[in-house]
Amino acid sequence: MSLTTYPHIYKKEQILKLKRLNKLSNDRKFFFSSVKGTLPGIISHCNNINEILGRCYLGICKLNSFFGLSKDPSDKLSVSKSPSVYTLPSKIFKEGGGNGDNTTTQTDILKNAQDQVILSKKIDELQTQVKELSSKIEPEPLTKEDIKKTYETLSRIESGLKGIIGIE
């Protein structure tokens, strides 16, 4: 049986197993509706919700402890809050920026975004104009010749179908 089939978290190069809160249920299956509306079914439903919320809370505590944001109540060796966690991402972004002068690229991006906004407004205006023009267009009235042509084509189709089916 694999260790990862049980609820766990990976912290400081160790796999810490979470305790099972309900010994009678499967770790990966939870039922949130009962077949019968009896009191034991409702209790089981509430226990399943409680178990998932408990696991989520423990996971959040362990993640916060791993990043040094808070002390984990279930781990005696966890460290307390450290402000160095917040400075690390800012250092990473500053190092990745090159010389730190990104104003030219930012202005180019801003100009492109403004151009796209202008183009999208123009497209919207053109769409409204097309809708207005299409509503103004009136269909041509049918003539007797058009009606005769459609009647002839329908009669040919009908005779062809009768020939295929074998009726008269």
From Swiss-Prot:
Database matches in InterPro entries: Caulimo_AT (IPR004917)
Tree of life domain: Viruses
Pfam families: Cauli_AT
Role summary: This protein is involved in virus transmission.
Protein family: Belongs to the caulimoviridae ORF II family.
Protein name per the record: Aphid transmission protein
Annotated organism of origin: Carnation etched ring virus (CERV)
